[in-house]
Amino acid sequence: EQLNGDELTEFLNTYLTEMSGIAVRFGGTIDKIMGDSIMVFFGDPVSRGVQNDAISCVSMAIAMRKAMKKLQQRWQSAGIKEIPSLRMGINTGLCKVGNFGTEHHLNYTLLGRSVNLASRLESAACDEEILISLSTYELVKHSIDCTNRGEIAVKGFSKPVIAYSVIDMIKQEN
């Protein structure tokens, strides 16, 4: 069943409200919303340290995936046939953060190779998958359960990159 304009607006706003709320709850900065995509970053304007920022980011992604499953069930119950899926790419690294643009239009955003790698990982991810880079994995491996996906060829990078698929948080023993 195709959605009319008002239904599509409600559908998209419900999704974006849910996901952006999760991003903010975990301390992320919402960079931009492009259609049904949300770009979120951690570490600016406030960083809790590189490792804590990485753990918060991956934890946010896990929470988003769980919330998306609930939204998908709700939409399916409402009779929506084409239910979107979720894919995410996460990388940790240096980038340039600031206001970019012209005197007519400025965006507070981030640029650089690290940002490009996160985008490429998102493109390489399967439906419902969160792919993280080796640099992120090294920071979160004691808190997050992951599977090594091996080397992935990514556009714009001369060598393949090692990627990990996020499973879930590691359960802490009391």
Language model region names:
Residues 57, 90-93, 114-117, 121:
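Alpha-helical scaffolding flanking metal-ion-dependent phosphate/phosphodiester catalytic sites
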Residues 95, 118, 124-174:
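Cytosolic regulatory/linker segments at or just downstream of nucleotide-handling modules
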Residues 26-27, 31-34, 65-89, 151-154, ...:
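Catalytic core regions of nucleotide second-messenger enzymes
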Residues 54, 64, 110-114:
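A short beta-strand-to-alpha-helix junction
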Residues 1-59:
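Catalytic NTP-binding/metal-coordinating core of nucleotidyl cyclase/transferase enzymes
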